[in-house]
Regions:
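Conserved catalytic core of the tyrosine transesterase superfamily
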Residues: 1-282
């Protein structure tokens, strides 16, 4: 069996393992890219299974460290290789010789409220308005926006059930403005059950890249800073929620953070905001 066939089988096993662990398609795509880089580094005659750890370290040095790749890319590459050897060859690589790099926490970039209001008030598509407001007013990640179902909406209690990372469920708040917009969208689109934003066959989940591509156009149209992304809407939700006097523990739960330290970074951002979000959360 040639290496190309083996590599396809190995990548498939890695994908199956990631799915069992509830990891996202984006994570698998990143792992697959890292593994293809690893395979392409060696010639076709190389027996990947029998590589020594020093050979793998040389690859990491050449392709990540000397190439000046960012820490996140380095960590993904190392994690992908470790998982490959574990699930395909039952080999545990030495974490001391092949360590992960500690990531430097960056201060989140938020989309200011005034910019958000300009964008959403000028947006003609009701669907696009819903995407924007679910992140800005409820703190959803882009993948989570794509997965929202009619059954997840509890308008009576102003709550939304969210299917987050690792398929973990949590609840976040639904302001009146969001409920009204979602209700209008469902009426116009005649959506009574299932996904709010279905894929091409009206049953599958919409690809979140559709939202990302839409926001890329928004960035150009409104001349937004390069650091602004769709995720900046989620950062804005967290910042304005705390600026309005919201609870840090409640925010941790709504964002789906395992570690409270991840949430505390928004405290520093919130202290810099003199004006409140102006959004009625309950």
């Amino acid at each position: 069996m040639n290496n190309n066939v083996n590599q396809t089988k190995w990548i498939k096993k890695v994908e199956e393992n990631l799915k069992l662990r509830g990891r996202s398609q984006k994570t698998f795509d990143n792992y697959k890219s890292a593994l293809l880089r690893f395979f392409n580094y060696y010639n076709e005659e190389t027996n990947i299974k029998k590589l020594k750890e020093e050979d793998i370290i040389n690859f990491v040095n050449d392709e990540y460290i000397k190439a000046n790749k960012c820490k996140a890319t380095y960590n993904t590459g190392v994690a992908a290789i470790r998982l490959l050897y574990l699930v395909c060859f039952n080999i545990t690589l030495n974490k001391i010789l092949l360590p992960s790099s500690k990531l430097i926490k960056r201060v989140p970039t938020i989309l200011p409220r005034d910019k958000f209001l300009i964008i959403i008030n000028n947006e003609e598509s009701l669907k696009h308005k819903c995407w924007l407001i679910l992140s800005f007013c409820s703190g959803l990640r882009v993948d989570e926006v794509a997965k929202v179902k009619v059954e997840d909406i509890n308008s009576k209690e102003h709550k939304l059930k969210v299917l987050g990372k690792g398929n973990k469920e949590r609840y976040t708040i639904l302001p009146d403005i969001t409920i009204k917009l979602l209700r209008l969208y469902c009426i116009r689109k005649n959506i009574r059950t299932g996904y709010l934003f279905p894929g091409s066959n009206n049953k599958e989940v919409m690809n979140s890249k559709t939202i990302i591509n839409y926001f890329s156009v928004i960035k150009v149209d409104y001349n937004l800073d390069n650091n602004i992304s769709f995720h900046s809407l989620r950062h804005a939700f967290a910042t304005y929620y705390l600026a309005n006097g919201g609870s840090l523990l409640a925010l941790q739960s709504m964002l789906g953070h395992t570690d409270l330290n991840t949430t505390t970074i928004y405290l520093h951002l919130a202290q810099n905001f003199n004006e409140l979000a102006g959004i009625k959360y309950v």
